[in-house]
Amino acid sequence: MQVYLFDNTLDGLLTAVFDSFFRKQQDVMLLVEGEQLPLFADEPYRVVTDSEKATRVWKGLEKHLSKDGLHMITISWLSEERALNQPLFNFICKVFRPHPLTPSPRGEGGAFGREGSLNTLLSLERNASDEDVLAVRNTCRRVLHEQLRMKQFIRFQKAKDGTYLGVVSPDHNVLPLIIDHFQDRFNDQPWLIYDAKRHYGYYYSLTPNPSLTPNPSPTGEGNFKGEGSNYKVIRVTFEDEASVPFDLSNGKMDADILSDNDQLFQDLWRTYFKAICIKERMNPKKQLSDMPRRYWKYMTEKNAT
């Protein structure tokens, strides 16, 4: 077995797929740089991320898989789970290899250019009996489930300048998946959604900024409405998080920039939350299932002033 070391990026993983075919190595263990190597392993091969190789592999996937299959890859990658690396690598490699169900003739362009049987490829991406496919599909489901929860559980605070701030810390990197939702729903007000765990966020401005240009990856990951036309959605990071005007531990905005009436609205929301609670029908177990405790620290109704 040949060990491949890569930089834990999607482009790096796609490059590893390309290199494994170029080097004609099928039995590959994919590890991230710095991970412990297995005993008695040969000298590892270090994958140098190459955007051209990654683009070529992705274009091959676009020919071989349905849109759902492509989304399964990109969405599962947002899980940031290292346990996904090997199954995802194996799954992508299987796409380009002849499948036992139906032989796929090789055409021009090598493995990444051949046209296989669509029915065969659809059978592969839906084959729950394949442990690699199942691992990728289950990971994709977990990410989509948290995406839905983020849409439900983000709580905003209003600053004096009219900007709304929402701080989150999801298990998975779901911000790129929810920005379209908030842009469609709150397109008449500026807002910032910040991921305290990953130290970045997205700012929606009412004023288009044509000087900003998107920098998409070959997979299209991270592209959403606002990029490419009006550039109202801007990815932001802070050089010094110690100076940000909000508390990363609970998402609370500093009192000196908080809108004068926002505290009143927070108190009203807590009062409403308590008022609609029917004590005789309280079900803490059900509540924890629908609203996991890990989200509470950023939710207004669960935090007193």
Where are these regions (language model features)?
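N-terminal ordered "arm"
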Residues: 1-53
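Short, hydrophobic/amphipathic alpha-helical patches that form generic packing surfaces
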Residues: 13-23, 90-94, 180-184, 267-274
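Charged, alpha-helical interface segments at or near domain boundaries
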Residues: 31-98, 116-148
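Short coil/turn segments at secondary-structure boundaries
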Residues: 71-76, 196-197, 282-288
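Intrinsic disorder/low-complexity segments
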Residues: 99-116, 207-230
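Internal, well-folded beta-alpha domain core
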Residues: 122-206, 229-238, 242-243
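Long, compositionally biased intrinsically disordered terminal regions
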Residues: 190, 202, 235-305
